[in-house]
From Swiss-Prot:
InterPro entries: STI1/HOP_DP, STI1_HS-bd, TPR-like_helical_dom_sf, TPR_rpt
Any one cellular-component term (Gene Ontology): cytosol
Phosphoserine PTM positions: S168
TPR repeats: from-to residues: 2-35, 37-69, 70-103, 243-276, 278-310, 322-355, 382-415, 417-449, 450-483
Annotated GO MF terms: Hsp90 protein binding; preprotein binding
Species for this entry: Arabidopsis thaliana
PTM entry text: Phosphorylated. Acetylated.
Region Disordered, residue ranges: 117-137, 198-245
Swiss-Prot/TrEMBL keywords: Acetylation, Chaperone, Cytoplasm, Nucleus, Phosphoprotein, Repeat, Stress response, TPR repeat
Lineage of origin: Eukaryota, Viridiplantae, Streptophyta, Embryophyta, Tracheophyta
Motif segment (Bipartite nuclear localization signal): 240-257
Name this polypeptide is given: Hsp70-Hsp90 organizing protein 2
Length: 571
């Protein structure tokens, strides 16, 4: 049940449904409250929802349960970063690296935490920070007619939440007139916002907080002519508009597959305005589409470097890293080539947890694993390892035999013989679930490989699942009706089933069989079926009705199942 909930949580997380992921991981935690991986996963889901307090709580629990696990400290550091607790984040990442010095995620996280801590110490406190604190902010914005309607706009609400979480983020949104309007309401002052057709942006002098008497003076003054835009502001805006125009022309050319023209426009935009890294990432996308992967990687590195200098949006930096990872993946030919791909995607995810990037990371890890298997594939060495395993098996050195059979499987994962032999070893060692899994793999690889049925039936017999073992042996006999090993297996199962039917089991055997039977979902369904409950009641109280029931083949099969499991005894 816990594994199922965990799997659902992972699937929801990969698809970007973080709320569902939290719910599924919570269900799994309720079933296995000491599983550190579940707390780690839920911490990541909370962080993706910007619920950093909850993410921190789960990360602390992860470290408490598994203090020697590097990923726990990665979660802890990420949560502290989200809460702008930069020194604590540095400490968490550093502790993680003491445990796992080669972990790229921890290295990248530590670098980001140190950079954030440095920026935090270097930047002056925001003078407007108090205006955005507490629930009073939302009350003021709701009460004022000029901002009430803005609260219906999701992007505006998200910006205000970001500013409330970290008042320093106000600098990122000062060009948004809605934010300026909200700032005026919160500070109880009148701030002139840019109207359509204005050529200048708000200067610093316009943001100075006036005295409380100034609004009254403004009303008494005669209207004055609009001041001429200061040249530096007008030129700056014109420059940005010109760069944006070049970007739009580049986008249009890109859509038409006119890549050379697109590159020219993006390059021109970069020359005009070097403070917007989207021009660089767009040019990188063109290089990627053209198959010029080295050029794409150079542009992505340039975008990341420039983005950090400008303190650009983390999402833009993450996009550049993701694009670089894609280019590296296109160039990968052997499994080792995927290592920088995976590292780059991991760095992108530390910047911004994006479902698409996570999907690409999973694909890269899967491709690396598949290539490793292909590169390791060698049937001749596989046969040698299997023979070594056989020698150890004969000497009853089963752990050594398992090791060689495992190596044989790695060298040739399509050979059912290695799985069959390892299943026999697991059976000898009492590791029945592992033995059953290997036996089923034998049958999956080659349905005509009779040893697979023999191994699976033997494991089920030792697990006292006699009905299941009987069914397995009979499936094998469909391929070879005269196979003596399978016939002997059927005979042993019949003896045990008849022993139960006659009531010859000892009290201990009966109790054990009943307990095992109650774990069988089929038995549970039979016992909860209203029709079968009536049948069982008639068997005890109404022999005539019971006789009619026995004429129904389906009911008879279910009764036989209950008898075999020891739940029902016929006397």
């Amino acid at each position: 049940m816990a594994d199922e909930a965990k799997a659902k949580g992972n699937a929801a997380f990969s698809s970007g449904d973080f709320n569902s992921a939290v719910n599924h991981f919570t269900d799994a935690i309720n079933l296995t409250p000491t599983n550190h991986v579940l707390f780690s996963n839920r911490s990541a889901a909370h962080a993706s929802l910007n619920h950093y307090d909850e993410a921190l709580s789960d990360a602390k629990k992860t470290v408490e349960l598994k203090p020697d696990w590097g990923k726990g400290y990665s979660r802890l550091g990420a949560a502290h970063l989200g809460l702008n607790q930069f020194d604590e984040a540095v400490e968490a990442y550093s502790k993680g690296l003491e445990i796992d010095p080669s972990n790229e995620g921890l290295k990248s996280g530590l670098a980001d935490a140190k950079a954030s801590a440095s920026r935090s110490r270097a930047s002056a406190p925001n003078p407007f920070g108090d205006a955005f604190q507490g629930p009073e902010m939302w009350s003021k914005l709701t009460a004022d007619p000029s901002t009430r309607g803005l609260l219906k706009q999701p992007d505006f609400v998200n910006m205000m939440k970001e500013i409330q979480r970290n008042p320093s983020n106000l600098n990122l949104y000062l060009q948004d007139q809605r934010v300026m309007q909200a700032l005026g309401v919160l500070l109880n002052i009148q701030i002139r916002t840019q109207q359509a057709g204005d050529d200048m942006e708000i200067g610093e002098e316009e943001m100075a907080v006036p005295s409380r008497k100034e609004p009254e003076v403004e009303k008494k003054r005669k209207p004055e002519p609009e001041p001429e835009p200061e040249p530096e502001f007008g030129e700056e805006k014109q420059k940005k508009l010109k760069a944006q125009k070049e970007k739009e022309l580049g986008n249009a050319a890109y859509k038409k597959k006119d890549f050379e023209t697109a590159i020219q426009h993006y390059s021109t935009a970069m020359e005009i305005d070097d403070e917007d890294i989207s021009y660089i990432t767009n040019r990188a996308a063109v290089h990627l589409e053209m198959g010029k992967y080295d050029e794409c990687i150079k542009d992505c590195d340039k975008a990341v470097e420039r983005g950090r200098e400008l303190r650009s949006d983390y999402k833009m930096v993450a996009k550049a890293l993701t694009r670089k990872g894609t280019a590296l993946g296109k160039m990968a030919k052997v499994s080792k080539d995927y290592e920088p791909v995976i590292q780059t995607y991991q760095k992108a995810l530390t910047e911004h947890r994006n479902p698409e990037t996570l999907k690409r990371l999973n694909e890269a890890e899967r491709a690396k694993k598949e290539l490793e298997q292909q590169e390791y594939y060698d049937p001749n060495i596989g046969d040698e390892e299997r023979e070594k395993g056989n020698d150890f098996f004969k000497e009853q050195k089963y752990p050594d035999a398992v090791r060689h059979y495992t190596e044989a499987i790695k060298r040739n994962p399509k050979d059912p013989r290695a799985y069959s032999n390892r299943a026999a070893c697991y059976t000898k060692l009492g590791a029945m679930p592992e033995g059953l899994k290997d036996a089923e793999k034998c049958i999956e690889l080659d349905p005509t490989f009779l040893k697979g049925y023999s191994r699976k039936g033997a494991v089920q017999f030792f697990m006292k699942e006699y009905d299941n073992a009987m069914e397995t042996y009979q499936k094998g006999l469909e391929h070879d009706p005269n196979n003596q090993e399978l016939l002997d297996g059927v005979k042993r199962c019949v003896q045990q089933i008849n022993k139960a039917n006659r009531g010859d089991l000892t009290p201990e055997e009966l109790k054990e069989r009943q307990a095992k039977g109650m774990q069988d979902p089929e038995i549970q369904n039979i016992l909860t079926d209203p029709v079968m409950r009536q049948v069982l009641s008639d068997l005890q109280e109404n022999p005539a009705a019971a006789q009619k029931h026995m004429q129904n083949p389906m009911i008879m099969n279910k009764i036989q199942k209950l008898i075999s499991s020891g739940i029902v005894q016929m006397k």
